[in-house]
Curated annotation (Swiss-Prot):
PANTHER family: GALACTOKINASE-RELATED, MEVALONATE KINASE/GALACTOKINASE. NCBIfam families: gal_kin, PRK05322.1. Signal peptide: none annotated. Mg(2+) binds at S130, E162. The keyword Transmembrane helix does not apply. GO terms for molecular function: ATP binding; galactokinase activity; magnesium ion binding. Keywords: ATP-binding, Carbohydrate metabolism, Cytoplasm, Galactose metabolism, Kinase, Magnesium, Metal-binding, Nucleotide-binding, Transferase. This is Galactokinase.
Amino acid sequence: MNSTDVTKGFTEQFGKQAEHTFFAPGRINLIGEHTDYNGGHVFPCAISLGTYAAVGTNEDNAFRLYSANFPKVGIIDIPFSDLFQDKRGLWTDYFQGMARVMKTAGANFTHGLNVYINGNLPDGAGLSSSASLEMLVGTILNSLFDGGFEPLELVQFGVKVENDYIGVNSGVMDQFAIEMGRANQATLLDTNTMKYEYLPVEMGDNVIVIMNTNKRRELADSKYNERRSECEKALAMLQKGIEVKSLGQLSEDEFDENTYLIYDPILIKRARHAVFENQRTLKASKALQDGDLKTFGKLVSASGVSLAFDYEVTGIELDTLVTNALKQRGVLGARMTGAGFGGCAIAIVNSADVEDFIDNVGKAYREKIGYDAHFYVADIADGAKQLN
């Protein structure tokens, strides 16, 4: 898929030529899962799979929206006068949410837009299709209406849409990775301070393979909110005995010394993941900088174990992929990525072994789960941008 596909689709739907094209990537997180709302570090990168848009003007004072990913929905009109109406339960809620947040922040929509959208991110796969759409919309509206918003402002607008409009208490990682991504680099982001640095992803003879369970993350939103609530409860218990603003501020030793303040075994497990995952992320980013891929792979795998047993956000599909991935020749590490409860896992695989890896893991998954997983070699890409 490329911009030509959406310009053709635009003409078919709206009967005229598109004037602009845009792209926003998806993302994978190398390590640092469920740490972004706990004041910890994350280490994501944008990928070449993503969401495209072709855009043209109209004189109707409305956004006229079509997505090739939801063809049965057809064209949806959102008049400017309806921007602050309730959400409709459609994909257009993300467009409407971004538009209303930007309008509140001072954006001036001087004319209508026809927008044709098509993406190649599998829906519900945990590669951040919703954040990709939010950053795509933010880039479109900021570019075409001279909004003047900085990239980090668009990131915060996207988080606000998720939290206040869609109803998912997500952190900042997805929107940040998609808006701020750079080709062949991952971003080490301290979500507590929003300080970040770009680090080259140099894998030598290895590649990152994305493994899609093809199980939609149907429970992810409710369980995501539940995990965040559990971490907040654990933090509140710790704060009764020590001065700490977020779980991400604690070292492993500091956490171990103060677990007596958390008198719930489930909450201890949740908080332990947040604390230890943050430290793993710092160690992993340093290992990658040092070219120590063996250590990097071990830390990635350790993250997966913690997500399965302390945070409990995997499930049989992800566990089957990761367990079988780690049995294969040429694999340095593997774990789930994203919110969990379905979606995707990643593996670091020697490029010479990728074909056998996909065959073997795919066969084992089919035999265990009853349907196919899909595999993609990740291409680390730039963030959201206008293409023409």
